[in-house]
Amino acid sequence: MMLPLQGAQMLQVLEKSLRRSLPASLKVYGTVFHINHGNPFNLKAVVDKWPDFNTVVVCPQEQDMTDDLDHYTNTYQIYSKDPQNCQEFLGSPELINWKQHLQIQSSQPSLNEAIQNLAVIKSFKVKQTQRILYMAAETAKELAPFLLKSKILSPSGGKPKAINQEMFKLSSMDVTHAQLVSKFWHFGGNERSQRFIERCIQTFPTCCLLGPEGTPVCWDLMDQTGEMRMAGTLPEYRLHGLVTYVIYSHAQKLGKLGFPVYSHVDYSNEAMQKMSYTLQHVPIPRSWNQWNCVPL
């Protein structure tokens, strides 16, 4: 059975339920939170049953997924209370179009088995990417205080070092900066990623530092799941703590709006892990997962 959730009341009940399952539900919780705050990306939430759902999938409306090669748009966020038994639901042809290039995002590594099994049944190849998920201490305090119990937070008080404010000016990104962001984004560098970035810049709060020429030298964006993403610094401005300052400023801006603040870092990126520690972001290992699926 497949049930699209209609109306504000159902979606608010879903958000509350997902909140009780944090951090395993974080990627879906963040997405549903923004659906309930105006739904700027025009997404839908589908469950296997209601109100006692086992699995929820959030994705764009069918009419928005017209480009079979655009996995940035063809993205599904999934949370399941029963990852071992969600394969049948995820395999419903009317739920996920496995004939498209797509990506699945989840805070649950335990979904891997179901996705790998579906790859054989539906004949697509799948590549899993796993990263460290980080939740800002203030967000953890409010949504999942138990995460802070065993964590030693940085003595910095979560604040970055000061920057040269005569040289750099705190600002927001403009849609004309999308090409620059795409060029330096690990998952970007193409026309479709640039379109996705343009949409994120137009839709959600961003943060950047403008350099002496008045153009961005360091930046941070937010995607449709509410995650801070696509941070970058021009090579000649690296190692000066600018990205720490930008991410701190962006997190403050999102926090003031009442948004949950979270991000992810590659296991090999020690500089960004150190920065996350400085800013008192709480690490949740293996909790950022993405599966890129390409039909054979």
Curated annotation (Swiss-Prot):
EC code(s) of this entry: 2.3.1.13, 2.3.1.71
Modification N6-acetyllysine, positions: 16, 127, 141, 159, 183, 256
Protein species of origin: Pongo abelii (Sumatran orangutan)
GO BP term, example: response to toxic substance
Protein purpose: Mitochondrial acyltransferase which transfers an acyl group to the N-terminus of glycine and glutamine, although much less efficiently. Can conjugate a multitude of substrates to form a variety of N-acylglycines, thereby detoxify xenobiotics, such as benzoic acid or salicylic acid, and endogenous organic acids, such as isovaleric acid.
Reaction(s) catalysed by this chain's protein: an acyl-CoA + glycine = an N-acylglycine + CoA + H(+); benzoyl-CoA + glycine = N-benzoylglycine + CoA + H(+)
Location of the protein in the cell: Mitochondrion
UniProt-recorded Gene Ontology molecular function terms: glycine N-acyltransferase activity; glycine N-benzoyltransferase activity
Gene name per UniProt: GLYAT
Upper classification of the organism: Eukaryota, Metazoa, Chordata, Craniata, Vertebrata
Family recorded in the similarity comment: Belongs to the glycine N-acyltransferase family.
Residues recorded as bearing N6-succinyllysine in the entry: 16, 127, 141, 169, 183, 256
Gene3D superfamilies linked: 3.40.630.30
Protein's UniProt name: Glycine N-acyltransferase
Alphabetical keyword list: Acetylation, Acyltransferase, Detoxification, Mitochondrion, Transferase
EC category name: transferase
Keyword Mitochondrion carried by entry: yes
InterPro entries cross-referenced by the UniProt entry: Acyl_CoA_acyltransferase, Glycine_N-acyltransferase, Glycine_N-acyltransferase_C, Glycine_N-acyltransferase_N
UniProt feature coiled coil, ranges: none
GO cellular component: mitochondrion
